[in-house]
A protein has these predicted regions:
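Short secondary-structure capping/turn micro-motifs that flank functional sites
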Residues: 10, 28-29, 83, 93, ...
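Generic secondary-structure boundary/loop-capping signal
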Residues: 30, 35, 42, 90, ...
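Secondary-structure end/capping motifs
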Residues: 46-125
Length: 149
C-alpha cells in the first residue's frame, strides 16, 4: 500500500485492514531524518529573500504549534475544512515529531534521501552535487537561532 495521509490510515486501522510495514516517524533509519523539506524557486528566493524567510518562519511556527498544542492545531484543521474529523487530526498531530526541526540536520536529510534515490536508480547525481547545486540553508539556520525556545 502506498503512503496514505489522514484520514485514510485511521479509517483502515479502524476497519482492521492491512498493517504497518514502515512507520517513518518511529522506524530507524527513517525516523532520524525529516520527512519533508520546504522547496522554493531559486529565482524567487534570490529576488525575494524577506518574503522567503517569512514563509519559512510561518511554516516553522506552525510546526511548533502542532508540537505544543496539537489539540488547538487539530481544531483549526477541522474548522478550516482541511481535515474532516477532529480525532483523526489530533491523532496525526500527536504522533508526528513536529518538534524535531531544531534538532535534525536538513543537509543530512538531503544526503540520506539522495543516496536512497540514487541507489534505486531514480537520480544520477550524487548527494554532494545535489546539496551544492540545489540547497541554501541560510534562512533555516537564521531562523533556528531566531526561534530558539
Amino acid at each position: 500500500m502506498p503512503f496514505l495521509a489522514p484520514p485514510e490510515p485511521q479509517d483502515l486501522r479502524a476497519r482492521h485492514i492491512g498493517h504497518v510495514i514502515v512507520n517513518t516517524a518511529v522506524d530507524r533509519p527513517w525516523s532520524q531524518y525529516f520527512c519533508c523539506l520546504l522547496g522554493g524557486n531559486a529565482e524567487y528566493v534570490r529576488t525575494h529573500p524577506v518574503a522567503t524567510k517569512r514563509v519559512l518562519r510561518a511554516v516553522l511556527k506552525a510546526a511548533d504549534l502542532c508540537a505544543t498544542e496539537p489539540d488547538r492545531a487539530a481544531r483549526r484543521l477541522v474548522d478550516s475544512g482541511f481535515a474532516p474529523r477532529y480525532d483523526y487530526a489530533f491523532q496525526t498531530l500527536s504522533e508526528l515529531p513536529y518538534d524535531k526541526w531544531r534538532e535534525y540536520d536538513a543537509e543530512d536529510t538531503m544526503r540520506f534521501y539522495a543516496l536512497r534515490l540514487r541507489e534505486a536508480g531514480f537520480i544520477k547525481s550524487g548527494p554532494q552535487k545535489i546539496i551544492a547545486d540545489g540547497t541554501d540553508w541560510r534562512f533555516l539556520n537564521e531562523l533556528k537561532r531566531e526561534l530558539k525556545a
